Amino acid sequence: MDNFQYSVQLSDREWAEFSATADECGLLQADLASGDEPLSSDIDQGDSSGSSPPGPPPLFTGQLVSQGRGQQSRELEDVAAQQLVSRSQCEPVLALEASHQVAGTSTQSEAPLFPSLDSVCPGQALSFPGPATCRDKMQRLLQGPAPSSPSKAPHSPESPGHSDNPQSSPDSLEASPRNPGRKKRRAVGAKGTKHSGSLDSAATQMSSPQLTRPKEALMSGTLMAKAQQDKPQPDSTSPEQMAREESGLDLSTPILITEQDQIRKTSRAALHVVSKPVQEVHPDVPMASPNVSTRASKPQPDVALPKPASKPQSDIASSTHPFTPDVSLSTLAFKCQPNTNQSTPASEPDMALSTPASEPDTALSTPASEPDTALSTPASEPDTALSTPASRSQLVKAEFASACTPGLHVDLSAAGSEIKPEVSSSMPAAVDVLRTDLPRSVSKTESKESVSIPVKPSLSPISQAEAAMVDTGVSVPPGGSIEKPAGQFSAGSSGESCLGPVQAPKKKKVRFSMAIPSHEDSGSGEPTGSPFLTPEQPPVPRTAAGSRGGSAAWDAVAVAPRLPQPRILKHLPPPVSSVSAEAESGNCFAVTLPEAYEFFFCDTIEEEDEDVEDEEAASQALDEVQWPDTCEFFFRDSRAQRSRCQRGHSPVSPPRADTVAPVPPEGLVPISIPEVYEHFFTEEGFGHRQPAATPMQTSELSREGGLEASTKPVSPTAEHLSLTVRKAGELRSPLTSFTFSQNDMCLVFVAFATWAVRTSDLQAPDAWKTVLLANIGTISAIRYFRRQVGRGHSGRPRSSSSSNPSC
């Protein structure tokens, strides 16, 4: 009754619009409540991640199903449910629905609508499987219409859409046999493996009418290809894809490498037969290769072009990681290489099986010998013994594969241009020159040589050392084979057997010349030998245990640049000679400040009377040299007055002095100047001391006899005494005057030093000069005062100098 009543009151279009609107309102409210609003990325891709929980089933549609409708009403409900789920997930795509179509819409206009609707949204509808009712609905939708639906096509305008809908949905789901793993993965991510089984069965049932709609298949295939490019999962291995999701893309797991091998085996035939670019034939490999190397974050950013980086990983007969990290950084590559080579020993035969369609027979032997080389190298020396050979072989192998692969030569040559600067930054210069100078065909022999010789890793220190010394560029014909890498000894000279005929280099250029001859002096490439090797270590052939002869040669070469060291030693003797000169000369003033002060200002305090005269004479000479103008300015008049007074007392003294001159030296020479001052210059004055000298002169004259003689020489004695005092005064007057001035100057200098230190900025950079001068002057003044106090003559010279002008 209910079904009949609704079918009478509502037409098919009105019923579809009503059910879609009612269910849409319910589902949108549920989406808003649960926070599962569709993202813009999901809408653009026409696909969903399958991680959001399914919405609640439409209640009104469920009631209609439980009431048992007819076949036509169930089809209408399925269409409405399909539109509802699709519109709730990708609403901008499904703006055109049944209610917005014009009555005159033809089959061609409605046919692309539902295929596009189904090709975009079945993934979303399948990503949100609900209870058993929704799953049964989807299954009925995929199985096809009832026999009554084609008969009703001419009666209702929407029947072409309904009749096209079952045909369009298999076409929209044609990616299921082509890509069953993706559907299964989404089903597993949403509900589990049981839904994926139902989807696979449905896809298998509808596999027959897939090719009926080529245009719609092209649209759906384009959308699926876009989804595949956005999602980096491969096409052919669904169990490994689920394992990849669970394992988190670990680099060291063998599942990942096996998966790559399976990708190669499945896509190798289409790739090389059709000769299309890699990203067109199977676009998921370029996206999967970054996922493979996501753990090693540095190698991928270093390779600037994603296409050359992904093509060697999909086509070259070597593992993915040994190529890409070795291109970018050799040091980082060898941290990654042991993991990849040791964890995937079984993947090498798979890659070798995938190469015969495109690569010559020489490349088939490369993977067989490569694991021996990579696994035989000790892991304890990843930077020195492993860096140069492994990266060299892998890079050359990459270039060789680029020359052999049909569609990849240009891109890999572009990749090689980017690769070479990065390799040259972490490898010897000779390896870089070898890469740039060799033709492409020559790299084939080098790859075969560098891989099949197991002793290559142990020889890398020699190549690095000699490459640091000499940078050579080798030009080899395309058909010939090359010798060892640049800078090493040739195989003919070292005794090592080579895979191909060894050809001597024809052109070699020397970066810098040294005093010791090098390999470039001989045209055959053999070392001239004796300067490089010490006598204890003759040249020996290289072996797997390592070549001590080559290392000794490098040691000898490393010592060679130290020949200019005698030049440095030539500069060392002058400090030694200066030190010895300082040790020999005790009066050197350039060593320390106290010695400098002792040299300039020091007169040691000596209490012995024997040295006083010499000290006073030295000080007098020093004073006359240092202060001549001062003495002449202050004390010239006093000396002139003194000389006039003495000349007034004895006007005839000069001729008498000549006659009596030989007598005084005997008694006056041993007398010091202070004693002369004490004897002659007292507080009483010069005239009071004159009778004291008379008995001395009388005793001298009494020895000659005669009273007349004693009375006559009185005047000569007085004149002699005046002459002696005058000479003493003339000799002492500069010293007396300077002694006075030196005391005053010392006091003035001490005051000046105190003022300078107090008023200057001691934080300035030049404050040390002021402090140094003030300290030196003050210390000299203090020492002078101490010397004067020790003698006890500080006050008398001043009084005598004041008494002289009074005469």
From Swiss-Prot:
Positions with biased composition (Basic residues): 180-194
InterPro entries registered for this protein in UniProt: Perm1
Keyword terms: Cytoplasm, Methylation, Nucleus, Phosphoprotein, Transcription, Transcription regulation
Listed Polar residues bias regions: 162-171, 195-211, 311-346, 363-391
Induction: By PPARGC1A, PPARGC1B, ESRRA, ESRRB and ESRRG.
Residues recorded with modification Phosphothreonine: T534
Subcellular location: Cytoplasm; Nucleus
Omega-N-methylarginine modifications at: R548
GO CC entries: cytoplasm; nucleoplasm; nucleus
Region listing for Disordered, in residue ranges: 29-80, 121-391, 517-548
An example Gene Ontology biological process: regulation of DNA-templated transcription
Coiled-coil residue spans: none
Tissues of expression: Highly expressed in skeletal muscles and heart with lower levels in brown adipose tissue (at protein level). Muscle-specific expression is increased by endurance exercise.
Ion transport in keyword set: no
Keyword Transcription: yes
Biased composition annotated in UniProt, kind: Low complexity: 40-52, 145-160
Function, as annotated: Regulates the expression of selective PPARGC1A/B and ESRRA/B/G target genes with roles in glucose and lipid metabolism, energy transfer, contractile function, muscle mitochondrial biogenesis and oxidative capacity. Required for the efficient induction of MT-CO2, MT-CO3, COX4I1, TFB1M, TFB2M, POLRMT and SIRT3 by PPARGC1A. Positively regulates the PPARGC1A/ESRRG-induced expression of CKMT2, TNNI3 and SLC2A4 and negatively regulates the PPARGC1A/ESRRG-induced expression of PDK4.
Name by which UniProt lists this protein: PGC-1 and ERR-induced regulator in muscle protein 1
Name of the encoding gene: Perm1
